[in-house]
Amino acid sequence: MSSKKYELDAAAFEDKPESHSDAEMTPQKPQRRQSVLSKAVSEHDERATGPATDLLPPSKGLTTEEAEELLKKYGRNELPEKKTPSWLIYVRGLWGPMPAALWIAIIIEFALENWPDGAILFAIQIANATIGWYETIKAGDAVAALKNSLKPTATVYRDSKWQQIDAAVLVPGDLVKLASGSAVPADCSINEGVIDVDEAALTGESLPVTMGPEHMPKMGSNVVRGEVEGTVQYTGSLTFFGKTAALLQSVESDLGNIHVILRRVMFSLCAISFMLCMCCFIYLLARFYETFRHALQFAVVVLVVSIPIALEIVVTTTLAVGSKHLSKHKIIVTKLSAIEMMSGVNMLCSDKTGTLTLNKMEIQEQCFTFEEGNDLKSTLVLAALAAKWREPPRDALDTMVLGAADLDECDNYQQLNFVPFDPTTKRTAATLVDRRSGEKFDVTKGAPHVILQMVYNQDEINDEVVDIIDSLAARGVRCLSVAKTDQQGRWHMAGILTFLDPPRPDTKDTIRRSKEYGVDVKMITGDHLLIAKEMCRMLDLDPNILTADKLPQIKDANDLPEDLGEKYGDMMLSVGGFAQVFPEHKFMIVETLRQRGYTCAMTGDGVNDAPALKRADVGIAVHGATDAARAAADMVLTEPGLSVVVEAMLVSREVFQRMLSFLTYRISATLQLVCFFFIACFSLTPKAYGSVDPHFQFFHLPVLMFMLITLLNDGCLMTIGYDHVIPSERPQKWNLPVVFVSASILAAVACGSSLMLLWIGLEGYSSQYYENSWFHRLGLAQLPQGKLVTMMYLKISISDFLTLFSSRTGGHFFFYMPPSPILFCGAIISLLVSTMAASFWHKSRPDNVLTEGLAWGQTNAEKLLPLWVWIYCIVWWFVQDVVKVLAHICMDAVDLFGCVSDASGSGPIKPYSDDMKVNGFEPVKKPAEKSTEKALNSSVSSASHKALEGLREDTHSPIEEASPVNVYVSRDQK
């Protein structure tokens, strides 16, 4: 038997807790609580079913001129969207903690009439804002490109002809065609005729609704059967989509976590730098009797250089590069900060249909036959004979059967009569004659218990068939019975076919990988409890499932209690998923998990998912999601399946690692600079070593050298977004105390080595101490003042770049992971520029500080001074790296600031206990024994029979999945 499976769109079979009636747009459900969408639904339906005078009469089409006038009046048929003006983005780049500090420095420099220095600072400020603006605009353009590529179209009658146009330019009064397979482009009234409309994306109900002139198909729904002409009544913000978008604004979005982290880092570094610089300022005035002007200039320059001016630019660039990388994995990021949040996700709430499953119904090779000679192939042929096999399928069930059967074999029979599906009889029937033998017979297919009532040997096979139906129902399997008459006209049960929407081939492995990466997966579905249990079994998820009636009942989804996590968190964590839930339950589940301390991602596709998507830390609109879901989501998938989400997590963790290494480096560089000049100002002063230059009583660098360090470092750091990283195996969580400790260790070694070199240089510069200095021991001439300044500039510059390579590998040695070529080349170029500048600096007095190139000199030893500085820096770089690794080992050993225990986010998941019993929920503690299986089957028998009765009427059943058993079982084999 071939292992081939036959596919069918599973959306037509998806089950939800309740269904529409043909006459109601939004039926009342006694257990359903008012959701954040209910207000929009009720208002829209009151308007749609109100007096006829409220609606436009049936349209006969518009002209282009009329449509243009109406477009000016009503606006474009698009969801309302808030867009920040480009100029405002640029202005925001000129304000904030970092820009504000730089503005203060610029004002002070100009006030002191230091025009060149002020101009340099001003240029840095403008460059900072421009690059930040460019990266933000570029990221926004990527999102806009996605929206443009997904723009829906509409078939409209304009200028006396039918044409395809952008649905965004539809206006009230347009005549549109609503046909099977097309989306409803706006809120429309039906001129005449009847269509079946799928409103699952709007209401969460999967059963199609039959609509006529008294109904109004809504924008965002889909026509599944029929074709009519309709009149556009409402567009844009006046549609149900527009109402939903307005309601979503009530769910406030948290400020991106990365911005909170950056602000904390900025304020911490600014506070430290400001405090130390103020101490230097006061000390210089009191100790060296420096003028207010000179002391203030020194303090301001050190402050500006020490604070991370380009912090937001580098982070924005890194996130933008990450968004481009994600787009290659079929993931579009609508909010850059979502990448950082995604790296910390440790709880994923996933839809079932289409995400965990293929969303394609498949005939399985598990077939139960009741007569010798029958098998899956012959049963499928009989099922196809009970349909018009050479005509387009009449419904989803026929599509599946005809796609699986051998239609060439069916052509050996002539269909004399065909009775289509009748809701009363729950089956189809046909009379046929075999062209080869002339035998005449009847066939039928339908709900198993209906067919069972027809067969002549019902008493003989009744228990067997009921056991089969019950066992399949208990596993969430859908089934279809086929029967045939013999020469005496008696009905014989030919077989029972099984079909399901199976998991995607990679879903089970993807869930396993997710758990290995520290992410727990919860399935959230509106489907039947049995389906959810079977799906969890197939995917190795916890079979304990909560249904809607076991969840806490919340009256107002906009006013959730703050103790949900405390009361219900452990209960929700102890199950594998949730079944038969409504949109407001999804919202509540996400909020409970967030209160429990988890970073939660949520997948969804419909308008009803939008509030939960917005509430989640990371909302993910899956492939084929509605515009409303995309608008509420942080990420949009352009490829189906859960594996895409896992790829998003890994890429996001890579981005997080880049940001972590950058922040560690940036904090280290700031502490190194400010602490070096602070300590040098107090203890290692040229005045103490015999300096008589009034402008060289304490050690400092000219502003030009400071700015050169800043520009070269920031320019190189722009490439960190392209650096090689290895994603963490655990969810990433910002632990700023650990980051500051790691950065402080790097800074302490770099600062200590700089202070030591300054001490060596001052002794080599001093006439009093030269004889005992290292310069004298190495055979070097006494160090001039200008070369001392330039030497320290080169040392600080080299140490900064080497610290970058140490910070990027965390607790490993710097050679653990090679840098990317672009980062390496950027660092080499910057180091080369710094070395060349220090070597051949023209002897001058910028800011009255004497400077001189290190390579200028009479002897070869003097000309090789830059090389000696390089050797010194490299030796201390190795020391720095060893100290870093040892420090990380000690930090991990003592779990400093929870660097180990808090790595995965919210701690271990508690196993189920009796204390978790809420609303009667009890877990599946072990598989049922055979002695209890029959009782379980009988408990679901009546429910499964009732569901199977409606199999053909609504092309739906609450029994959906089956285990992939590729066998067929005959009665004799049993």
Curated annotation (Swiss-Prot):
Side Cytoplasmic, residues: 1-92, 138-264, 322-630, 685-697, 762-812, 888-974
Predominant cellular place of this UniProt entry's protein: membrane
Record InterPro entries: ATPase_P-typ_cation-transptr_N (IPR004014), ATPase_P-typ_cyto_dom_N (IPR023299), ATPase_P-typ_P_site (IPR018303), ATPase_P-typ_TM_dom_sf (IPR023298), ATPase_P-typ_transduc_dom_A_sf (IPR008250), HAD-like_sf (IPR036412), HAD_sf (IPR023214), P-type_ATPase_IIIA (IPR006534)
Protein's membrane topology: Multi-pass membrane protein
Cell compartment(s), UniProt: Membrane
Catalyzed reactions: ATP + H2O + H(+)(in) = ADP + phosphate + 2 H(+)(out)
EC number: 7.1.2.1
Segments of this protein annotated with the region Disordered: 1-61, 950-974
Gene Ontology MF annotations: ATP binding; ATP hydrolysis activity; metal ion binding; P-type proton-exporting transporter activity
CDD domains named among the record's database cross-references: P-type_ATPase_H
One GO cellular component term: membrane
Residue stretches of biased makeup (Basic and acidic residues): 1-23, 950-959
Keywords: ATP-binding, Hydrogen ion transport, Ion transport, Magnesium, Membrane, Metal-binding, Nucleotide-binding, Phosphoprotein, Translocase, Transmembrane, Transmembrane helix, Transport
Extracellular topological domain: 113-117, 287-294, 652-661, 713-737, 841-868
Family matches, as Pfam families: Cation_ATPase_N, E1-E2_ATPase, Hydrolase
GO biological process: proton export across plasma membrane
Membrane-spanning parts: 93-112, 118-137, 265-286, 295-321, 631-651, 662-684, 698-712, 738-761, 813-840, 869-887
Record: active site: 351
Residue sites binding Mg(2+) per the record: 605, 609, 714
NCBIfam families: ATPase-IIIA_H, ATPase_P-type
Family to which the UniProt record says this protein belongs: Belongs to the cation transport ATPase (P-type) (TC 3.A.3) family. Type IIIA subfamily.
Family matches, as PANTHER family: CALCIUM-TRANSPORTING ATPASE
UniProt-recorded name of the protein: Probable proton ATPase 1A
Organism: Leishmania donovani
Lineage, opening ranks: Eukaryota, Discoba, Euglenozoa, Kinetoplastea, Metakinetoplastina
Originating gene: H1A
